[in-house]
Amino acid sequence: MKNYHAPDEKGFFGEHGGLYVSETLIPALKELEQAYNEAKNDPEFWAEFRRDLKHYVGRPSPVYHAARLSEHLGGAQIWLKREDLNHTGAHKVNNTIGQALLARRMGKKRVIAETGAGQHGVASATVAARFGMTCDVYMGADDIQRQMPNVFRMKLLGANVIGVDSGSRTLKDAMNEAMREWVARVDDTFYIIGTAAGPAPYPEMVRDFQCVIGNEAKAQMQEATGRQPDVAVACVGGGSNAIGLFYPYIEEENVRLVGVEAGGLGVDTPDHAAPITSGAPIGVLHGFRSYLMQDENGQVLGTHSVSAGLDYPGIGPEHSHLHDIKRVEYTVAKDDEALEAFDLLCRFEGIIPALESSHAVAWAVKNAPKMGKDQVILVNLSGRGDKDINTVAKLKGIEL
């Protein structure tokens, strides 16, 4: 796929994306777009971004050959891009560093964020402390119960965590509240969106900050294996870790790209979070147009996933576009497959993955045996699983 360019000047990726917000937010988004366009062309901005990624986050994150897991499965060699080794334990911090630098450049003293699994909340609280800003994090009440360790982490870092009791009490509702708050305090507040979704320019901006993942991986895989992987795979909720891995590979036609949505209890049930795989129609949510789980009246449907971070009814607009142009294949891993992959990676490699990342590992577990021993699968291990041990223990009937 040569000459891939997106989004267009209106923030559209094909027919997805754009700017669907109330009039009151338009000036804030235009101000943000202008600031980002200036920063994007300022070498000093990127130099500072890279410095922080190196000295604060600990990048580059390594690629690691999961040799014992590969041998156990028989077939393709599985390599992991170790985003779990970043400061704060996931890929989220790549993006929050970039947005915090932008907030500071715009003179904003306060940041707000939404969070599902709590990883983006922790990463936002972390950079707020790093840059001396106040931070409020909106989190669904159900997610707070699932992710208590991360809630406490955010508070330790000085953030105020605001529980959201409306709707499904998960990520979607947290995002609604955060957008409402931004409208109310747009003058002094910067909204750090945690995924490659939301109104323009957020999907492009988040991608640009996250594509450090794929850029590093390309150089590292070349050095480690003398070639690029046959397949690069990542889990997809809103889709920031996935677009970070995929974007630098889009024009590399020999590399198959696979996005793994949350299959929950199965896409033939109502309990999943897989808008593309389940054939959901296009809708508008949180300021952008994309595939969206909704009923015949356009009401957003409830979602289910064992992982709080994939529990989202929409998907980032660039993913919808990459699906439309058939550059990326989207599929699912169900809860039980993700949990099996979680166990396998723990036992064979001594790595406890996030339940989100376990969905991508599950694809490799299922497909590596069907491939040749000389073939290579690169899995984006987007985060570590410390935050999920309570969930997993509960599912195994173990009291912690």
From Swiss-Prot:
Pathway assignment: Amino-acid biosynthesis; L-tryptophan biosynthesis; L-tryptophan from chorismate: step 5/5
Modified residues (N6-(pyridoxal phosphate)lysine): K92
InterPro entries found in the cross-reference section: Trp_synth_b_CS, Trp_synth_beta, Trp_synth_beta/beta-like, TrpB-like_PALP, TrpB-like_PALP_sf
Coiled coil regions, renumbered to chain: none
UniProt GO MF annotations: tryptophan synthase activity
Catalytic reaction list: (1S,2R)-1-C-(indol-3-yl)glycerol 3-phosphate + L-serine = D-glyceraldehyde 3-phosphate + L-tryptophan + H2O
Entry EC number(s): 4.2.1.20
Entry-linked Pfam families: PALP
Quaternary context: Tetramer of two alpha and two beta chains.
Protein name: Tryptophan synthase beta chain
